[in-house]
Amino acid sequence: YCCSTAGEMQLNDTGLILEIVDRVVANHSIDESRIYLTGWSNGCSLSQKLANDHSEVFAAVACMSYYLLDDPRPDYSPIPIMEIHGLEDQIILYSNDAIHLPNLDAQKHGAIQNLLQWAEMNGCEGKSPDSNSPSVFYSVQSFTNCANGTEVSLVTLYAADHNPYEESYDVFPGNGGTVDTNGIAWAFLSRFSKAIEP
């Protein structure tokens, strides 16, 4: 969607995901009120784009290591958003004062700015998070009083690079088992469902 081959070839990744959702709904017995988005790196940015563009479809987002690169859509309706990001990320920098990818759009903001942008989009109360839950290896900053009963959260991993997961993948080391990021994401997502119109 945003970078590398898909971006260069202008592939319709959002259309593909929506088609997959439509086929799964048509062919399987699923709870349509609990269709969630998640992804890592470009997949996180795509998850946030889908939330922005098609908020009527998805119940919540919890993704890892990237930001929303688009402007808010006028027809966006608030849904819960969580982004999980390693403080030591050298690919998509936490602060994004600079970036190692040739994508100028990604230099607009970092993890904190992404949190604040979603808080504004979700009509959250206050200019700063009203919840801060620090622990030894990570912290969770959240806006909890938002439109549609939503929340917006940023999980900051103190000792993680671009890969926030426990296990290493390819050339990206994991967090060494210090933080169960999958568990954090699922605990967030599973709290939310969406009212489905008949």
Locations of regions flagged by a protein language model:
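Acidic/histidine-rich helix-loop elements
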Residues: Y1-M9, P102-N103, E166-G177
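Gly/Ser-rich "nucleophile elbow"/oxyanion-hole loop immediately N-terminal to the catalytic nucleophile
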Residues: Y1-N42
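Soluble non-cytosolic domains of exported or imported proteins
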Residues: G7-G15, S41, N52, D105-H109, ...
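Short, hydrophobic alpha-helix immediately C-terminal to the catalytic nucleophile
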Residues: L18, Q48-N52, W186
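Primarily recognizes the serine-hydrolase "nucleophile elbow" in alpha/beta-hydrolase
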Residues: V25-N27, E32-I79, Q90
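Alpha/beta-hydrolase-fold serine-hydrolase catalytic core, especially in secreted/extracellular enzymes
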Residues: I79, L116-P198
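Short beta-strand/loop motif that positions the catalytic acidic residue
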Residues: E83-H85, D89
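Acidic catalytic loop of the alpha/beta-hydrolase fold
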Residues: D89-I92, H162-P164
